[in-house]
Amino acid sequence: QSFHLLPRQSALTNVELPLNYAKVPKKERRERALKALERVGLADRVNFKPNQLSGGQMQRVAIARAIVNNPKLLLADEPTGALDTKSGAQVMELFQKLNDEGVSVLMITHDPEIAAHAKRVVMIRDGELQEKR
């Protein structure tokens, strides 16, 4: 999978990018990006460039970038696919917290253990929607 991170920029700068487009002032941009990286467990990697990060760490930078603008809807395609079990559990815990804060999370996964975290599960089988719960 590709996380569309800017290869020559730090994790922090990559997370700041959508805030830059939204014209958020520099100081607030930095604070919000640092908080997002902290939420995904990467506070100690803020100055690392993508080539200095593991695949799972790059995935978490992409998640931090997705949540930095405080979205009402988060679309996540295989958000734990490149993560080890511990990091995957941390991401699912973060998604649960975001949902508790009012963010709707629409997640696509092939992993039944990850799907078990969802309040509602809809499967596509042979081109048809099947609701499990």
Predicted segments with their positions:
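Conserved switch/coupling elements of ABC/ABC-like ATPase nucleotide-binding domains
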Residues: D126-K132
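ABC family nucleotide-binding domain
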Residues: Q1-R125
